[in-house]
Structure formats: structure tokens, C-alpha cells
Amino acid sequence: MYASSARDGIPGKWCNARRKQLPLLISKDFPAELYHSLPCKSLENGHIKKVKGVKATLAEAPATPTEKSNSEVPQKKLKVLVAGGGIGGLVFALAGKKRGFDVLVFERDISAIRGEGQYRGPIQIQSNALAALEAIDMDVAEEIMNAGCITGQRINGLVDGISGNWYCKFDTFTPAVERGLPVTRVISRMTLQQILARLQGEDVIMNESHVVNFADDGETVTVNPELCQQYTGDLLVGADGIRSKVRTNLFGPSELTYSGYTCYTGIADFVPADIDTAGYRVFLGHKQYFVSSDVGGGKMQWYAFHNEPAGGVDAPNGKKERLLKIFGGWCDNVIDLSVATDEDAILRRDIYDRPPTFSWGKGRVTLLGDSVHAMQPNLGQGGCMAIEDSYQLALELEKAWSRSAESGSPMDVISSLRSYESARKLRVGVIHGLARMAAIMASAYKAYLGVGLGPLSFITKFRIPHPGRVGGRFFIDLGMPLMLSWVLGGNGEKLEGRIQHCRLSEKANDQLRNWFEDDDALERATDAEWLLLPAGNSNAALETLVLSRDENMPCTIGSVSHANIPGKSVVIPLSQVSDMHARISYNGGAFLGTAFRSDHGTWFIDNEGRRYRVSPNFPMRFHSSDVIVFGSDKAAFRIKAMKFAPKTAAKEDRQAVGAA
């Protein structure tokens, strides 16, 4: 039970908790203005013992109802067989066990759960799925959320891939807070599966048991796993993924639908400069896009999508090289993250989905997750839909059992499965369509006139905004809040028994609303080191300059030292650089460059490739990724904001090109 002092101090409904150390939960009516940012938390991955296959037995119902703890849920006379030990199968197994059913999961290979084999990277669990996990088991939901990294209380959204400028920001925080839902997190897929598998118990998951066939005689279902004996249960749940054997046996073989995109994915030890303010971004380009997300622990996960025929193969150790070729010329956020990723950490796969279907099952067999509604990853809702499926299926089985117990008649398993399917089809179908639509939008995105016009592509160099980009933003700004509100909160009313609440540990920075509306305020909030990095092949003699964020320490740049001027003096001994050429100062969270009168001038190249001369004695704001040129192209520097300055640049004796 929560402490009475905390409970009495905050209005709203409260629910009991089974662990005293759980984060404080507060009512959804608590003022949203009081949510402020906290750093992401993560837990060490645990270990799981190898699961041995055992024969399941039909549990007997208790003779008399007794009060039991959560670990002693009275079992019911219902044996549920589950094909597939992925996230959907394991979440459903947990939900079924919590409701007292005898569940047995057949999994072909649990090496991923044990942390072996290729690392598949993190998974985003959004507010709707986290709420479903809470409705299944609050303790389990807390453990999963504590192991994840919160991204929903930061800025997320669409970005132009070339310039890095924000195109549309997504507010996933407000829909969650207004509905009393957990805030979106990213968690290691392996960690999530380990938590779910550990809580099942060793007698629940059958390893090396791939379900390839089954028989439904109307009263029971018998499965025939490879290399295993037959098992019989009251129903079968196919949670065996996009290439589901259960689905094939139900409805016959069917072709997957290729999305038109191949996907490179990787994870890197990399911390962006704006890690405290930005969670995930989708960088848009014509027929290609790049997704990056903070996953906690100083790591970033990314996905790079490129429109091309299926079945492509890279040369040995050639994935990174091709990735940089495809996205060459894109903004620093994309290039830096790609460069920071090791070759052996990059995977490639073609993206497929399945068209929506009205047939989810037959008789005593039903499907769940990717086996019936595999969708493209553009909304991050594939795993979330499987979690929602799991909750709904367990709920419908529980209702059918209760009706059976009250009436004294046999449980109507078949009707309960059809009820589950009916409850899920519309919502899943809409989200499936939205995921496809997101891919179409990415394919059609054109930042400038001339993009994709072949012989007329030279028009691109004039950087004229494409009309579709302007019009598209209007419709996205109008429709995105409504879409996010429904996707994240549209299933909340079906979560029976879950009390709406929010956590103080999920509070956002009090400037979050301002950041959504003001790109400049968002950039000024970046807590990072600012550097001038030599740009171009002719700058081998130049060294990195570290700029000071002390407003009383401006940086004076010239061909000779100016030790008598307050601040730092940087010497660039080139003939095109005047004695006192320019000054860089810091004011109000922004860097300003002031050019003095000189024969060769000072030039800026902004993040969209536009080059212009800086007017003398007129301070000009510059941004990360801009290029500043002192006198000529031989003294060009790229401006870069970094969370941590390079060690070589941090040394004081290397902060200037010449003696100061």
C-alpha cells in the first residue's frame, strides 16, 4: 500500500501496489505542468537458465475458493497451447497464467532469450502497450518499465534528412498524461523477453519445439512440434510470427507483401548533443528515410530504409560502406551515428508485411500478433499490437470461464476466440493501414523542387522548398495529434480494472511545451560542447577549436595574436586571414559570429548548403552543422555541437591553431 502521507497529499484515485519500492503513482488529474525531466534508468540484464521440455498436465480446479497471493492463482480446467515464444506469445502466456489457465509455450529457439545469437536491438513499447501490461500484471509492468529508457517525455518527430531541421514534432507525452497512461519507453528486446520468460517458470516454455502441424477435432487441439511428442490442449494460439505455420495450416500458404524497402539497422555507442531534449527522430528523404532513437546506457539504435528491389546482398563487410553511400550528404545526425557504428553491428533485412484479413482463426485455433497482422515498423506499433492482443484474448477466455462457472455449463472456447477476434480487428486494421501510409509518405517526401526529376534535378541546388513539403506539413500538423491520441489512448477503455494514474518518475521538463512550438528555444536548451572542426581536404594543418560557453570569454580570430583583448585569441597563420578577422561570442544559449572588415571576408554555408558572405560588424547566429570560412576555402571549419568534446580537442594546448 502506498504511504498515507503521499496518498493524502495528491488528489485522485489510487490503486494498491504489491511492491513498496514502486515509483509513486499519481492521479491523471494532477497538473501536467509539474512533470519535469529525469534521466533514463536501466537495469542490468539478468540471466535465464536453459529451459527443458516437460510434459504439461491438466490442472485441477481448486475444491474451494481460498484467498491466495499472486503467485498462487487458482488454476482453471483449461489448457492453452501457444505456438511461438516471442513477445506476443510470452505476454499472452503471462496473462493466461495470471487468470489461472494452464499455459504451455512451444518455441523453436530460445537462444535470443538467453542472450545468444545476433542482437536484434531494442523495441519501442508505447503508452497503449504499457497500459495493457499494467492491466495484465502491475509488478511485471513495473519491472519492464524500470528496465527501459523513457523517450516519450522528450521531443520526437519528423526531420528533414538533408538539413536536420524539424519538420513535424510528435507529442506522445500529453496523450499519455491526459489519459493516465505510462509514457513511451524503449527497451532491449532481449531484456524484455528475459523478464517475460523468467516469470513463466521453467515448465512453461518448451525449447526446440517448432509447431509445424496441428489437429482440431472440435473438442481439443493436438499439436505436433518438430522433434517432440504430441501435446493436446483445449485451444491453440498461433503467435509464431510473420511466417506462421499455424496460419498456413489454417488458411493455406500466402505470399508476404514486400514494402519496397530494405532496412539496415544497427546500434552504436553514441550520445547526441541534444540527448536530453530529443528522444527519437525520423529523418526524411526521397524514397529513403533514417530513424534514430535513444535506447539508454549511452547507446543509440538506428534504422535506415532505402527503396529498392527485394533480395539485395552486400559485399563482405560492405554494409557500412553502402549505408554511407546511400545517405552521403545527409545531416550530421545521420552521418555521425552511421560512422560510429561498427560494421559487425549492422544488419540488413527486407521489410515485409501481410495485408489485413478478416479471418483470424477457426474452431479452437486463433492467431495473435505478427502471425495475423504483421505490419511495417514505421509507427513502432507491431509489438504493441501483439501486447494488446494478448490482453484481450486472456480477457475473453476469462469471461467465458466465468460464464461457464456461473451457469454450470461447459466453457464455450470457440465463441470466446471469435469474440477476441471481433474486438481486435478494427483497431488493428486501422493501425496497420497507418503504418503503410507512413511508408508512402516517406516515399513521396521531397524537400526541394527538382528532387526525383532526373534531367531537371539541377533545380535542387537552388533549395526551393517543394510545395508538397509545405502542404504536407499542414495536414500532418492537423492530423498527427488526433492520430497519436487515438493510437496511444484508444484502447484504454477496454483495460478492465486498470486505474488511470501517472508516475512522478515520468515527468517532463517544464519547457517541453515551449520546445514543441519554438525550434530556437529547443536548440538553445542543448547542453553540449561546441567545436570548430577543420572542413575540406586542404585543411590538414588546421586543428579543432573548442568554443567557450562563457559569455565573458569571446574568441577572437586573426592571423596574429591579440593577448590584450579579453577572452581567447586564436591564430590562423594564413595570408587570406586578416590580423583581426572575426569574433565568436556566446549569448543566451547561442553562438554568434561577427566578421570584421577584411579583404577576403567571412563566409557561412548553412545546413541546407546555401553560401553567403557575412556583413561586417553585424553579429550572425550560427548553428551546428553550419560551415564558417575565414578568408578563403583554405580556412573552413564545420560547426559541431557534441555531448562530449574529443579528448584531443579538450587539451588546452590544442585549442588554437597557433600560439595565442
UniProtKB/Swiss-Prot annotation:
Cited PANTHER family: PTHR46496, ZEAXANTHIN EPOXIDASE, CHLOROPLASTIC (PTHR46496:SF1)
Q: Per the annotation, which location comes first and is thus the protein's main one?
A: plastid
**What organism does the UniProt record list as the source?**
Capsicum annuum
Could you name the Gene Ontology cellular component terms for this entry?
chloroplast membrane; chloroplast thylakoid membrane
Which positions does UniProt annotate for FAD binding?
79-107, 357-370
> Could you point out where the transit peptide sits in the sequence?
1-49
Cofactor dependence is on: FAD
Residue intervals of the FHA domain: 545-609
EC number in record = 1.14.15.21
Compartments in which it is found: Plastid, Chloroplast membrane; Plastid, Chloroplast thylakoid membrane
Task: Cite the entry's keywords alphabetically.
Answer: Abscisic acid biosynthesis, Chloroplast, FAD, Flavoprotein, Membrane, Oxidoreductase, Plastid, Thylakoid, Transit peptide
Q: Name one GO biological process term.
A: abscisic acid biosynthetic process
The protein's matches in SUPFAM superfamilies, at most eight in alphabetical order, are given as:
FAD/NAD(P)-binding domain (SSF51905), SMAD/FHA domain (SSF49879)
Pfam families with a match to the protein in the record: FAD_binding_3, FHA
Question: Which GO molecular function, any one, fits this protein according to its record?
Answer: zeaxanthin epoxidase activity
Q: What is this protein called?
A: Zeaxanthin epoxidase, chloroplastic
Which Gene3D superfamilies does this one have? 2.60.200.20, FAD/NAD(P)-binding domain
According to its UniProt entry, the function of this protein is described as: Converts zeaxanthin into antheraxanthin and subsequently violaxanthin. Also acts on beta-cryptoxanthin. Involved in the epoxidation of zeaxanthin.
